[in-house]
A protein has these predicted regions:
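Small-residue-enriched alpha-helical segments and adjacent helix-cap loops
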Residues: 2-28, 47-205, 214-218, 222, ...
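Internal alpha/beta scaffold segment
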Residues: 208-239, 251-253
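Active-site cores of enzymes that catalyze phosphoryl transfer or operate on phosphate-rich substrates
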Residues: 278-297
Length: 467
């Protein structure tokens, strides 16, 4: 499972590190990142914003109910799902920080104030639910790797960190990716990637390209923490202020050889993977997911990544009454609800569709996203959510094979897709510029097309079918 598929691309040129640096040290910044969290709130034009980090994306029903209550009593009544499987609350009062933190702590959603911003852990959301295993290609009957268990252990290690090489020096943008072997998390281009490779082993690398190391699955979370510590050590030695591994110049990046030495010092055995090539997989498809144990999971996405508290509560009630009492928030702004009787799954999926969830890959809303836009963001040149909704509701569905599409209110393109090709719809002030981006972030096919809002639906539908 670790070989012979294309590796993930470099970042789009418009989303590369924003400040220049020396070739050896990477970007030089005069301040740390400003990523919001549960404690560091962000003042937006529509009120204060909080980001609640969910390592692995998993919420218990009680935790999920709390978030709905917070959205209703403190926020604007909505929950935004992020591209890393976290939840954001908007429209909060500026003085709510203490109350918000207290309520999150009581439900285990803020286990460590000191480490909140570094708890960025994405994990394969269908792990253990659809029968996939990296061993399946060889006919093995071994159980699949439990990347959710990796996420829980990794989060505990991050929150317990108090060593000399303090992991709190990591940026809020540094991402740990835990992939069960299908390549879905690899496509997010994490900074430290763990991927199950079968037979109780895992591949470990910086970014998504080799060389890497093979470690025992039981050692994987500890190895990931040590990889992050190695990144910090290399960054300090180079004099860089890089937030992410890929921001370091190629000659100044951490190496598998030095990481192997660090693992050995910690009592973790590893073997080299000099030609490591990671698979690129796809996100979960909306619909019913059938498991080998006879139960089903429901996979849905939020329209433009945003749910009302009522929609969220419906999912929580289903999970509580008929499912496993857990919800998995995906990095593709969706939810996976596990553990339903197979015969009940179609009815429950229909109920979610009736409430406004995206439940089919045939929907025009599938793989469509947008930044906050006006009125929430002062930098935005348009109310991109309203324009996107009007465009997608026009009836020009592009089908299950359509490219992802993302509306952005300014050149920053906050939250845009990564990995494969996507349609970039950028507000210009008097319309939109529609561009198909390839895997490297460059333009694919014909040049960008500038249209007014009246012609936007047709332009977007045509761009999404680009091959």
């Amino acid at each position: 499972m670790l070989a012979a598929m294309s590796t993930t691309p470099a970042p789009p040129p418009d989303r590369a590190a924003a400040t220049a640096g020396t070739p050896s040290a990477g970007p030089v910044r005069e301040r740390g990142d400003a990523c919001p969290g549960a404690l560091r709130l962000h003042a937006a034009d529509d009120g204060t914003l909080a980001r609640i980090r969910l390592p692995g994306g998993v919420l218990t029903s009680r935790q999920a109910s709390l978030l709905a209550g917070l959205a209703e009593t403190l926020g604007d009544g909505h929950l935004d799902l992020t591209s890393r499987g976290n939840v954001q609350l908007r429209g909060l009062p500026a003085d709510c920080g203490g109350l918000l933190a207290e309520r999150l702590r009581l439900r285990g959603l803020l286990p460590s104030d000191r480490h909140d911003r570094i708890r960025n852990v994405a994990a394969s959301p269908l792990c253990g639910l659809d029968g996939f295993s990296p061993d399946s290609a060889s006919g093995s009957e071994r159980a699949p790797a439990d990347v959710q268990a990796w996420a829980r252990e990794l989060d505990g290690l991050l929150c317990a960190d108090d060593g000399a090489e303090a992991l709190t020096d990591l940026s809020g943008r540094f991402l740990f990716g835990l992939d069960d072997g299908r390549g879905d998390i690899v496509a997010l281009r994490p900074d430290v990637t763990l991927i199950a490779s079968g037979a109780g082993r895992a591949g470990l690398c910086f970014g998504t390209t080799g060389p890497g190391l093979r470690v025992a699955a039981a050692d994987a979370p500890r190895a990931a923490v040590l990889a992050a510590a190695e990144f910090l050590a290399v960054r300090e030695a180079s004099g860089s202020t890089a937030w992410r591994v890929r921001e370091l110049a190629p000659g100044a990046r951490p190496t598998a050889a030095r990481l192997a030495e660090r693992l050995t010092e910690a009592g973790i055995a590893s073997t080299p993977l000099p030609g490591l090539r990671l698979p690129l997989g796809e996100p979960p498809v909306p619909g019913v997911v059938t498991g080998p144990d006879g139960t089903s999971a429901l996979s849905v996405t939020a329209p433009l990544g945003r749910l009302t508290a009522a929609q969220w509560r419906l999912a929580v009630r289903m999970a509580t009454k008929e499912g496993e009492q857990t919800i998995r928030v995906t990095p593709w702004r969706g939810l996976v609800l596990p553990g339903f009787p197979a015969e009940e799954a179609p009815r429950l999926l229909a109920d979610l569709a009736d409430s406004g969830f995206v439940t089919s890959a045939e929907s025009a809303w599938h793989r469509a996203g947008a930044c906050a836009g006006r009125p929430g963001c002062a930098k935005s040149l348009a109310d991109v959510r309203a324009d996107a909704a009007a465009c997608l509701a026009s009836g020009q569905a592009a089908g299950a094979t359509a490219l992802p599409v993302y509306w952005s209110g300014c050149e920053r393109r906050c939250g845009h897709p990564g990995g494969g090709p996507w349609v970039d719809v950028l507000a210009t002030g008097d319309g939109y510029r529609v561009t198909v981006r390839d895997e490297s972030g460059g333009r694919q096919g014909a040049g960008p097309r500038t249209v007014t809002t009246a012609g936007l639906a047709g332009a977007v539908a045509a761009a999404r079918t680009t091959t």
